[in-house]
């Protein structure tokens, strides 16, 4: 089963629409806050059930699936974001530890395609995450990466409009 997490609702919808031709309706799920809270809960319940039954499904979602949703996928693809979101996304892959190997891939989408500039702080978080990842070695040390990320993020935000929040 695959989970794809993107930074904008518009891009989630666009990818979902593209994937519809490759999946049966029952195997492809769309999750964003464009759905009502009730519909989201219903879909998340169905996704959990299908995953527990071992069904192969694909979920295209915004970050809403990252926190507080206990799901376990074989493969996670995450659009570059802040390290906190990346770590949350990684927590949705092989969560139960039943697989010998499982993978989380980070993708850095074109700015013109993703259009995150209107989302407060996302571009700064992406820049800091990319810098921390570029500095890392082949063996990923999540603790070290997270420290690098926050160091880069705070350095980027220093003197910026967000410095009061930091």
Q: Where are the language model's segments positioned?
A:
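C-terminal helicase lobe and adjacent C-terminal extensions/tails of nucleic-acid helicase motors
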Residues: 1-5, 10, 14-41, 48-49, ...
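Short amphipathic alpha-helical segments, especially helix-boundary/capping motifs
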Residues: 20-23, 63-67
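Conserved ATPase-coupling elements of RecA-like P-loop NTPase cores
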Residues: 69-73
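Conserved two-lobed SF2 helicase motor
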Residues: 50-66
């Amino acid at each position: 089963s695959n989970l794809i997490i993107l930074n904008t609702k518009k891009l989630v919808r666009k990818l979902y629409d593209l994937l519809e031709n490759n999946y049966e309706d029952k195997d492809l799920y769309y999750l964003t806050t464009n759905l009502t809270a009730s519909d989201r809960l219903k879909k998340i319940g169905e996704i959990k059930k299908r995953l527990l039954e071992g069904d192969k499904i694909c979920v295209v979602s915004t970050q809403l699936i990252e926190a507080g949703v206990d799901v376990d996928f074989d493969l996670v693809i995450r659009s570059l974001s802040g390290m906190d979101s990346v770590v949350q996304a990684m927590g949705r892959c092989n969560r139960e530890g039943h697989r010998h190997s499982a993978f989380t891939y980070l993708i850095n989408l074109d700015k013109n395609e993703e259009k995150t500039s209107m989302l407060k702080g996302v571009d700064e978080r992406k820049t800091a995450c990319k810098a921390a990842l570029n500095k890392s070695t082949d063996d990923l040390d999540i603790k070290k990466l997270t420290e690098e990320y926050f160091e880069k993020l705070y350095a980027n935000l220093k003197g910026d409009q967000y410095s009061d929040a930091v």
